[in-house]
Amino acid sequence: MKDSLKPGLTYQFKYEVPEDKTVPFLYPEAPELQQMPKVLATGFMVGLFEWTCIQAVNPHIDWPDEQTVGIGINLNHLAATPPGLTVNVEVKLEEVDGRRLVFSIVADDGIDTISKGTHERFIIDAAKFNARVADKRK
């Protein structure tokens, strides 16, 4: 972790929603989801927020030896976004507590605010983390 990783860090990311990030594609094997509207799925939205936070942090850690993993999410999904619209995600690093990072998140699709919330990540040593995961497979 570098000294530049401090509260107040902001980052913005834009992402055009493709059809394969809509609700029916979240779990293609789930027949119930196949009947749902083709709008950005909350699960994919969470992934987009994680991706944005990763991009925000990576210049400030020893990537790829250090990485961050999600440990908490608290958000509202406020409006539906159809494919073709661009989601603008703005994150702000609110707190650095050792290796724990807390971000505030606001996202819009150019028409509506689609989400507000917080996301927590934890800085890991990638080699040690991957070794522990491999041990679970044994």
Where on the chain are the PLM-derived regions?
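A generic structural micro-feature
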Residues: 5-7, 67, 83, 97
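Catalytic strand-loop segment that frames the active site of acyl-thioester-processing enzymes
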Residues: 2-40
